[in-house]
Amino acid sequence: MKSKRKDNLSDADLAYKEELDTLVRQLIESRLEDAAAQPILQLLVEHATRSGGNITSVPKALQFLIEHKAALYDLYSAHMSGTGDDSYSVVLLLELMSFLDAIATPDDATEDQKKPAKEADKFKLMLYKVEAVMAARRMLANPATPAEVREKIASRKIQDWGNEYLTSLSTQIVAFFNLPETRDVYDSLPRSSDQMDVVAAEKQSVLQKFDTALLIPETLKFAEEITDYFFQNGFEYDAIDLLLEVDLIESIRRKCGNDHDLITRVTSYIISISAFGATYVETRRMLVVAYEMLLEAGRSAEALRIALKLDDQEKVRDVIFGCTNAATRRQLAYICASHGKYLSLAEKGGAESVLTPEDLDEIRGISSGEHLSGFFLILATELDVIEPKAPQDIFRSYPATKLNANFNITDGRLSKNMAFDSALGNLSHTFVNAFVNCGFGTDMLINVPDSDWVFHHFEYGLLCAAASVGLISLWNVEEGLSKVDKYEYSSNPYVKAGSYAAYGISSCNVVPESDPLSGLLLDKLETPDKTLCLGAVLGVAFGYAGTQRESLLEYLVPIVVSDETQYPHECSAMAAVALGLIFVGSGRQEASEAIVQKLLDLPDNTMDMPAKCQFACALGILQLGRMDASEVVIEALKAVEGEHGRIAELMVEACAYAGSGDVIRIQQFLKCCASAENEPKAKEAKQDADDAMEVDIPPKSPKQSAIDAAVSAVKNASETGGHDTKKEVKPARVGFKLDDDTSSAKRSVVNQSSVAILGIALTALGDSVGCAMLLRLFEHPLAFGSPCERRAVPLALALAYASNPSPQVIDALSKLTHDVDYYVSMHAIFALGIVGAGTNNARIAIKLQNLARSHTRDTTVTFIIRIAAGLLHMGKGTTTISPLHSEGLLLRKTALAGLLVTMTAALDMKNTFTHSMPFTLLFVAPAIRPRWMLTLLPNLEHVQVPCRVGNMVETTGTVGKQRRISGFQTHQTPVLVGASERAELATEEYVPCTTVLEGIVIVEKNDNVTMD
């Protein structure tokens, strides 16, 4: 910054400049040892630190003093080359030089100073200050120093030089700590406060010798003093950033005191920036600091959410046992239940425990989730959606197709004369019926008197139909078991297998104290019947998901490693998935070793690729969220030859970093997609394009398709006056072939690029910025990627935006539904269902109706459209399958695992959903939960409270108390809360026991408010 020219100065400015120039001239003519130097320096310091003038411009004193900076440095150098004695004048001069360096600009530098400088010259501001502090400390340690000087030195504070100076000093401190050599020395130093209080016995100068080991403790003390000032004056975000850079994040705890609002702002900021930690260790340190601050402040609900995010069982126990308020303790149990964390707490020894055995039983009961069904029916009653819906209500505006010809429901039961044309048509109605009525316990298709709908299916269709009974009775274990019981005694093995799966589905996210599943299913896992074993495996997978039950290893591991002659690949794959769901995120060694061994034994070809992908998915689920701890498994997978080995590697890596927002991992997945080895050959690409064009034109001859054969049989039966269609028509098998061409069996629509695309979405999950960038990231694969990459993009978007119908995502998927690639369009249709699952989104509903009109002759696409419609209307618009909760802070691993199984199967849905593995659609069950806010009194009785629900507004890092919602509407609880919405109470009569109003919220009467 150039000093103002004399021609541009007013008379007052000229006089002021002359006064300052005279003071500097007198100082230079004297020596620092002289008594006259001290008052001159005090006057200069007063002028420099005097505030005045416009806040947008530099004070005039600094504008006039800056040109004397070189002269002041020469004065100090002359002193040091002379006696070099410490004095109060030296301290003032060094501080003044440091202050002038803070406002210096490149224009102020001389030609010599503009040359490449030494490392020390980059930190003059910091070095001058360190030199001044060291000189002052030596004077205080010297007994000969006068008391008056001691008092003056002790009274000087770092904040005396103003905010701008502190900001400049903190910037240089951060730059100093970012030097590699500084980090090396810092890591080798002992982390104790004693090292900061050591006074050098001999005189040292950091200006003459750039001593990193000496500078580190001094700059750390500066950081502590600066952040103390920042916290006291409302600059807590700057203070947190500085402490993070100098690795002193733990010191935040003692700087906040008991200020409730300050703790709220600080912890919210720490939690939000923890996602951007360079390493998992750094992220964990930040979260632990926030946890300890909240726990010390008695904010148990917020501390519990951090403990759940850390996945630390001990911290969860500490929060529970440390909570003395009974209502808050019940609220903590409800939070754990919504997270899928069952609290199997034992009594804590010692006097510190305040919980009685009755309290522990109550906590265990609430966290088991057995309350969910009853409260959900209260929600349904209040919203007037308790009446069951039929699939025909969903398809009312759909055109008549081969899949719904002659389908009628009258008076709540099936017509005796109804004719069913295909297994796919029946199966689509079964899934839609189950999704729409899930959790309500009643429907108009299966659970009605004299209904034989379950038997209008074939093989795995029978299994899915029987299993759907459990989905209808979701969360209600007792009612579910009673309704499923009659199917267990069927003579058809597929129906019996479906009943076993239904037992588990009805127990999803519920841990009943009696554990009826162990008696019903465990002995079935050892049955020689492969179909029954598959059903039992599915039931165990659903019923024990996330329970970490070790006793199940001895049942499931032998099925996983078994030969194909013992169990088909589908059964072994589902056993592996069951292990993954039960031990999700634990990295259980026995389960991981079994799956890796199975992958090693599988042949290197593209046959049975859907099952191989499920093995890879199961292994990834075991490593969900384990980050660097999964490296051992990834290294072991390098020994697996073939495409399925590379798929497993990428799947494990994607799951290990799920929800981390790790940009480096996303770049690695993009690099995998761009690698030359994953680019399809031109011949294969052309063949894929030909296949896509061919599938869009279905065969016209009834002999070319099992569906047309079934339709012809139905028509003939009706023309001849046949009445018992069940005897005259055999339903078509799920997974019919459109032609006899086996060339497509040699090629797989799934490769490692497909998994890499899913990995990008998994990594970005939960990060709002990362998810928003997905649309941009996927533009390149859609435009230039291989067919496998393009086909995975819609599913990746659906995975990141499950039950979150963002307009931008809906627009992108709507365009892809008309893609020239048959598989891309089919995947986009299914993705629309996942994105809108449980929301009744009108835009998606209209889009699916239009698509149904466009694909009336394509039975496979029509089936997918109906599945998407069923997902869209899931729970009559009261549920969600998003794995995120607590305003996006927490990730339900069990929900994400189940969703990932379905999405992995969807990569090749023609060979899974419509062929050999339609039951993979049922794996959305662990992800289903109500999207609600329901209020209870401390005695757990339901109470209606006025509340506001609006769009979520991010207030972290903002000044003041901003509104946390916008565009809100006022309702009475219970209310529905969307993915991007937030709720808050609209009355002061009640006080919630948690700050996040989501799920089940306990409210207490506010005794400080008098109602009129």
Regions found by a protein language model. Give the residues of each.
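Extended alpha-helical assembly domains of large eukaryotic scaffold proteins
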Residues: 2-996, 1001-1002
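Long mid-to-C-terminal assembly/interaction modules of large eukaryotic proteins
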Residues: 1010-1011
